[in-house]
């Protein structure tokens, strides 16, 4: 019996691992070694097979997402993406809606690119790690030179042409202690309304991670720092992927949002420029090669293969006993298997490197998540969380400890912006009516 058409996500890499930058923490640059002499450009037959098989497999979906990542996909040139639109027009079923997405470092984006992306309604993800000093710490070009100015120039072009975009920000050793500053920069300086905050975890050996990696506690505190700012001022206006996913889990949806925190995984695969399909973007390795979409089995058949189903189910089945009895398991689900290289207090292998941070964050947001959940269940807007925070803040003295548990005083931490707004209101009273 053929597999039933259904929704899954394909991260396609038309240039493979090839990129014009040399970001120090990038795990994918080394994958170039898997395909020596391949040319690192997706050929026409793979391009057409990918789009045709994806559209056919997701015939019942409200919208089909066609995702291009890298490496750096803009190295393919605009004509590749023009060809993408031509193929989609020919291969799509009547009425089938398609959303094209592009994840880019933005350094090659100019007005021609931006006009094309705007005209064809691409959703663009821009990789940026915060203000200049934080961004340039690891995100450098092949010559080791900083990239911040080039990223901002590309982003400015996207904004001039009205391209819908979101920010993908890694949380690493250089910015991990500055959550609110990073968030405020993305929100206020760049105008980002959609954000992904991705932790950098580079496993070295044993239970060690690289010096560039964020620690578990750092990541948890980073998320809390951002959440406390977001919850007071931006619910409903700014969307942070981790917070949306968390709320979905508090609503009882254990497969919603990020695959990292879903109960099982396996529905997000990686397609190389050659047509090789891998179990996951983080498992582009010969041991996890499912097959090639131009050599017999289709994309859907490979995604639905027993091997891939077992890969996804293992996320739940390999959870240590420590995780199974954890009070925040419903929201965490053990994190991504790639980072489960610690040993539990019981001596069992398979604890996630960021476990301490996940517990910090999920326990901290339990009450506000319940508030939003209850608001939504009563048919109200989650923005009511702002009022809940405001009521609590009104009872807080300026010298009280901040609610983010940073150890700083309220007036010097998340209360600083509120105090500033209050001072402006006093200095500028409303006119007489």
Regions found by a protein language model. Give the residues of each.
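Radical SAM enzyme core and accessory elements
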Residues: 274-276, 285, 318-398, 409-433
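Canonical Radical SAM [4Fe-4S] cluster-binding loop centered on the CxxxCxxC motif
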Residues: 5-45, 415-419
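Cysteine-centered iron-sulfur cluster-binding motifs in ferredoxin-type domains/subunits
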Residues: 14-22, 72-75, 265, 323-325, ...
């Amino acid at each position: 019996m053929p597999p039933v058409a259904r929704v899954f996500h394909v991260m396609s890499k038309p240039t493979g691992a090839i990129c014009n930058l040399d970001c120090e923490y990038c795990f994918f640059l080394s994958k170039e070694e898997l395909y020596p002499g391949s040319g690192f450009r997706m050929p026409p037959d793979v391009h057409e097979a990918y789009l045709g098989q994806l559209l056919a497999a997701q015939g019942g979906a409200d919208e089909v997402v066609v995702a291009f990542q890298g490496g750096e996909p803009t190295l393919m040139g605009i004509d590749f993406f023009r060809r993408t639109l031509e193929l989609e027009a020919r291969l799509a079923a009547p009425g089938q809606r398609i959303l094209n997405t592009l994840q880019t470092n933005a350094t090659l984006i100019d007005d021609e690119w931006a006009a094309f992306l705007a005209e064809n309604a691409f959703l663009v993800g821009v990789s940026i790690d915060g203000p200049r000093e934080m961004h340039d710490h690891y995100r450098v070009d092949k010559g080791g030179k900083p990239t911040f100015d080039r990223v901002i120039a590309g982003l400015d072009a996207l904004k001039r042409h009205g391209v819908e975009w979101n920010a993908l920000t890694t949380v690493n050793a250089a910015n991990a202690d500055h959550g609110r500053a990073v968030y405020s920069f993305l929100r206020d300086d760049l105008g980002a309304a959609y954000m992904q905050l991705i932790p950098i975890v580079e496993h070295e050996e044993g239970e060690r991670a690289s010096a560039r990696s964020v620690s578990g506690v750092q990541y948890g505190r980073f998320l809390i720092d951002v959440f406390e700012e977001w919850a007071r001022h931006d619910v409903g206006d700014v969307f942070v992927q981790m917070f949306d996913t968390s709320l979905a889990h508090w609503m009882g949806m254990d497969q919603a949002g990020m695959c990292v925190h879903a109960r099982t995984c396996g529905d997000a695969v990686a397609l190389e420029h050659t047509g090789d399909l891998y179990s996951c973007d983080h498992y582009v390795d010969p041991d996890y090669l499912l097959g090639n979409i131009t050599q017999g089995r289709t994309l859907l058949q490979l995604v639905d293969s027993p091997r891939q189903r077992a890969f996804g189910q293992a996320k739940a089945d390999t959870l240590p006993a420590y995780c199974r009895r954890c009070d925040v398991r419903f929201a965490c689900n053990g994190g991504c298997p790639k980072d489960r290289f610690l040993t539990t207090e019981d001596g069992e292998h398979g604890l996630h490197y960021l476990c301490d941070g996940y517990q910090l964050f999920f326990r901290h947001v339990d009450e506000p998540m319940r508030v939003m959940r209850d608001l939504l269940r009563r048919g109200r807007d989650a923005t009511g969380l702002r009022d809940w925070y405001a009521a609590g803040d009104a009872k807080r003295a300026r010298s009280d400890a901040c609610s983010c548990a940073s150890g700083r005083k309220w007036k010097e931490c998340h209360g600083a912006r509120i105090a500033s707004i209050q001072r402006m209101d006093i200095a500028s009273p409303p006119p007489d009516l």
